[in-house]
């Protein structure tokens, strides 16, 4: 499959977010000093990073009900009749006695970037993942959206997941998701040396979670006591999150479940994309699309392999 097949109109829907995501809200909120944004493409470690930052902020919190109460998602719209002004007002009304942490799948300029000294002191924890792995994880995740949620938004299930992985890739996979993954990093890569941007790779988090969680703590400025570190590491482990996966499934966001149980915390692996449908041909097509978007060779290599990006 050639990368040219992802051009709009060839095999599936045009690029763009699903109807339950509104990218405008993050441009309208009143940003504050101390705000933290967890900016990650879909299925690239978003939930893990949200929980990491929350656990660092609290020194270890096993009792929260839904991570989306603790780390609100700047783009999610709970109902087609939701009033965007009201959703923005809710973000602005969040208490001032605790630093806000937000989730976003966006990159600048969709997500406003406040350069150091040029506005509110906002910190951006930016995570990327091997594109093959992210796309492999996306199809089962989309398939796990509840019938009620898809019916509410009038989105046909077969239109987003396809009959098999080849059809999924020929549709929104190559039209929207792969360009989004590479476009996200293309926007953040030039900002990686900014003092308020931390670029982390999912594979590095997996290879050495404790070192990278400490790195995130240093970056965002949360001081964790020696006594609290064991709890932070436990509550951010895959085993703990899998055992408490109901805390990570958007249960408080809408009036009924958005996801089937088990949709968010699935495998947490690296190097296993072939198990979910990434053939050598699809992998080559992903890379071909990627090179047309992410033209910096160093950035392209880092996108796939990880290791520190701050050189």
Identify the residue ranges that each predicted region occupies:
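An amphipathic alpha-helix signature
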Residues: 132-135, 210-217, 226-230, 283, ...
């Amino acid at each position: 499959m050639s990368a040219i097949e992802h051009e709009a109109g060839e095999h599936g829907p045009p690029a763009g977010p699903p109807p339950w995501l509104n990218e405008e809200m993050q441009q309208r909120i009143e940003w504050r000093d101390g705000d933290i944004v967890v900016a990650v493409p879909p299925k690239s470690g978003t939930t893990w990073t949200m929980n990491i930052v929350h656990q660092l902020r609290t020194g270890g919190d096993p009792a929260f009900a839904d991570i989306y109460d603790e780390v609100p998602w700047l783009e999610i719209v709970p109902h087609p009749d939701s009033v965007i002004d009201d959703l923005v007002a809710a973000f602005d009304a969040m208490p001032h006695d605790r630093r806000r942490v937000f989730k976003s799948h966006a990159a600048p300029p969709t997500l406003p970037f406040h350069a150091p000294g040029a506005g509110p002191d906002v910190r951006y924890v930016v995570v990327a993942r091997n594109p093959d792995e992210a796309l492999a994880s996306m199809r089962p995740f989309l398939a796990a959206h509840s019938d009620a949620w898809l019916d509410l938004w009038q989105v046909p299930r077969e239109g987003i997941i396809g009959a098999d992985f080849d059809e999924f890739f020929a549709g929104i996979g190559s039209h929207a998701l792969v360009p989004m993954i590479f476009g996200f990093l293309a926007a953040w890569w030039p900002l990686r040396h900014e003092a308020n941007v931390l670029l982390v790779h999912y594979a590095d988090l997996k290879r050495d979670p404790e070192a990278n969680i400490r790195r995130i703590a240093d970056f965002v400025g949360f001081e964790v006591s020696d006594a609290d570190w064991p709890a932070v590491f436990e509550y951010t482990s895959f085993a703990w999150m899998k055992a408490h996966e109901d805390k990570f499934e958007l249960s408080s966001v809408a009036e009924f479940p958005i996801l089937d149980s088990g949709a968010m915390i699935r495998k947490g692996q690296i190097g296993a994309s072939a198990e979910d449908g990434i053939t050598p041909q699809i992998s080559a097509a992903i890379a071909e699309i990627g090179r047309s978007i992410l033209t910096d060779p160093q950035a392209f290599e880092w996108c796939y392999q990880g290791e520190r990006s701050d050189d």
